[in-house]
Regions:
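Hydrophobic alpha-helical segments, chiefly the membrane-spanning helices
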Residues: 1-322
Length: 322
């Protein structure tokens, strides 16, 4: 049991570090070729920070572990919203930019409606669903890039912290090594997460919804804490909303397109599949609790954070039968 736990932890570390390297390399290359900063942030960085979830879900799907793919994507959304964003709101509520929040929120709920239609209507996540979700991702990227295309592009090479330019070979190395490390970390996480689930006698879905989801959400947690310390709580919440959208359209889209799978049955509540009665409804409820009050009052409130934290605690208790 000790070895799988250590390898699981190593997988998490590799995922996070690999993601850092990939983003650093990709961002450096983008700036080197004078791509506007807003486009870099909306595409390269956003995709890079979502790579841990993409690789874990894709690896799980290809290995025939649909429960791991599903749990990681949905669990990350629940964790991002009712734990990470909730901490930010509970500690330091802040005003929000309604206009910048509207687009990702609308895209998220439309994608969630499509996702839930497949789950409740067909009982499975099919390849056409994956293609639709990926098409939504591409459309969102195109809209975002078009909005930011007028932003002046930075000139010259990206300087390092000491004022020197970062060499091209280093940026390429960070990109390639980062991607490879993410792939290795994802395999370690999925394989050993499955072993741990069997040893503990709990469904893979539970492990994926909790431990794996929290682990792959660590980059968002670090960003949230950093933003909180610097007094930019609304920025943190904006990043989390974007990450949630990507978890639904990119992470789920990739995994389902590669290897379709049925809605997992991890456990039942009142004789009904918990995926249908708890996980997916909760995903929508916590996002609504986060975004609707913010859009209507133009402010994030402390009560939202406290309520979301209570919901997350109850969710974990139910998953582990406490």
């Amino acid at each position: 049991m000790l070895v799988p736990v250590l390898l699981f932890a190593l997988g998490l570390v590799l995922l996070i570090k690999g993601g850092d390297w990939f983003v650093d390399g990709a961002t450096g290359l983008a700036r080197r070729f004078h791509i506007p900063e807003i486009i870099v942030g909306a595409t390269v960085v956003s995709i890079g920070t979502t790579l841990p979830e993409v690789m874990v879900s894709a690896t799980g799907a290809l290995n025939g572990q649909g429960a791991m793919s599903y749990g990681n994507a949905i669990g990350s959304i629940i964790c991002n919203t009712s734990l990470i964003a909730a901490i930010t709101l509970a500690v330091r509520p802040a005003p929000v930019d309604v206009q910048s929040m509207k687009k990702p929120v609308i895209f998220f709920f439309v994608a969630a409606a499509v996702y839930c239609f497949a789950a409740y209507g067909m009982g499975e996540f099919t390849r056409p669903l994956g293609i639709v979700l990926l098409a939504m991702f591409v459309f969102y990227m195109v809209v975002t890039v078009r909005q930011g295309i007028k932003t002046p592009a930075p000139q010259g090479e990206e300087p390092h912290e000491d004022g020197t330019s970062v060499p091209l070979w280093k940026e390429l190395l960070l990109l390639v090594v980062g991607a490879a490390v993410i792939a290795v970390g994802a395999n370690l996480l999925v394989d050993n997460g499955t072993i741990i689930a069997k040893e503990l006698g709990v469904p893979e879905t539970v492990i994926a919804l909790t431990f794996v989801a929290l682990g792959t959400s660590l980059p968002e947690l670090v960003t949230a804490i950093t933003s909180l310390v610097k007094g930019h709580g609304s920025l943190s919440v904006g990043n989390i909303i974007g990450a949630n959208l990507f978890n639904l359209v990119l992470v789920s889209g990739v995994s389902v397109t590669l290897a379709p799978f049925e809605v997992p049955v991890g456990k039942t509540i009142f004789g009904i599949n918990s995926s249908l009665i708890l996980d997916m409804p909760l995903m929508i409820v916590v996002m609504a609790l986060l975004t609707v009050p913010a859009l209507t009052t133009k402010k994030l409130h402390r009560w939202q954070g406290i309520l979301l934290l209570c919901i997350y605690a109850a969710f974990c208790a139910i998953q582990f039968g406490l």
